[in-house]
Amino acid sequence: MPASLIDGREISALRRTELKQRVQYHVEQGQRAPGLAVVLIGNDPASVIYVSNKRKACEEVGITSHSYDLPAETTQEKLIELINELNQSDKIDGILIQLPLPKHINERTIIEHIKPEKDVDGFHPYNLGRLAQRNPFLRPCTPLGIMNLLHHYELNVKRKHAVVIGASNIVGRPMSLELLLAGATVTICHKFTQQLQKFVEIADFLIVATGKMDVIATDWLREHQVVIDVGMHRLPDGSIRGDIDFKKAVEKVAWITPVPGGVGPMTIVTLLENTMMSAARLRE
């Protein structure tokens, strides 16, 4: 029997509708709409598409998107100057720096210059530290989006074994913290993990964020599992797939996210929700 689909498009649409109503309410009360600064350095095709989608999503819910498109040769010093201006601006509630950055710019340095209360990506050490201490405020968008998906479908991780494949600062590490916060027993696997198959086979929840296709063989999967595929890869024919072979996996597991249409839409709506949360906090 094919797996049940975890539909990120449907759930993100519901959350966007709710968010739009909240934004409209605050505007009707005489408050300005939340403002999100979206900074793009260079013209990497994938980044251009991601930024365009984020700006369209802002427009859809009534959040004001402030665009800053900078040339690829922009220096780290100039970017920090812009961030400092945005940190001080009363019109900006959230700052998003589209990653990856050009090689001459240090991502960690840039992230650390964003005010934690405007760090709507949730990457600042302060925000990650709060998550680790079980007192989160602005949380990384992809892991939180995944948790919201699981909650909607009543897929409870408490007392279950969750295996996270990938240990990036953006997904894998904060994902493990979210799962711990929700009461899961968590195993993190990465490029140095030996006997990866063994860990995959014993997972109740499998979150795959390797950034590479087919690291996880579909014959490792089991019928009771919930599989969350964070990967996104464009194939030569223009189609998009995830880290896992969906057509094979959907016949083997209990629940699975499609790619596209699973995690991606939830990441964007969570970014918008973080911006709204930041705006509310800054007005206090």
UniProtKB/Swiss-Prot annotation:
GO terms for molecular function: methenyltetrahydrofolate cyclohydrolase activity; methylenetetrahydrofolate dehydrogenase (NADP+) activity. NADP(+) binds at residues 166-168. Keywords: Amino-acid biosynthesis, Histidine biosynthesis, Hydrolase, Methionine biosynthesis, Multifunctional enzyme, NADP, One-carbon metabolism, Oxidoreductase, Purine biosynthesis. It catalyses: (6R)-5,10-methylene-5,6,7,8-tetrahydrofolate + NADP(+) = (6R)-5,10-methenyltetrahydrofolate + NADPH; (6R)-5,10-methenyltetrahydrofolate + H2O = (6R)-10-formyltetrahydrofolate + H(+). CDD domains: NAD_bind_m-THF_DH_Cyclohyd. GO terms for cellular component: cytosol. The keyword Transferase does not apply. Pfam families: THF_DHG_CYH, THF_DHG_CYH_C. One of its GO terms (biological process) is tetrahydrofolate interconversion. Pathway: One-carbon metabolism; tetrahydrofolate interconversion. Its EC number is 1.5.1.5, 3.5.4.9. Gene3D superfamilies: Leucine Dehydrogenase, chain A, domain 1, NAD(P)-binding Rossmann-like Domain. InterPro entries: Aminoacid_DH-like_N_sf, NAD(P)-bd_dom_sf, THF_DH/CycHdrlase, THF_DH/CycHdrlase_cat_dom, THF_DH/CycHdrlase_CS, THF_DH/CycHdrlase_NAD-bd_dom. Transmembrane segments: none annotated. Catalyzes the oxidation of 5,10-methylenetetrahydrofolate to 5,10-methenyltetrahydrofolate and then the hydrolysis of 5,10-methenyltetrahydrofolate to 10-formyltetrahydrofolate. Homodimer. Belongs to the tetrahydrofolate dehydrogenase/cyclohydrolase family. HAMAP family: THF_DHG_CYH. This is Bifunctional protein FolD.
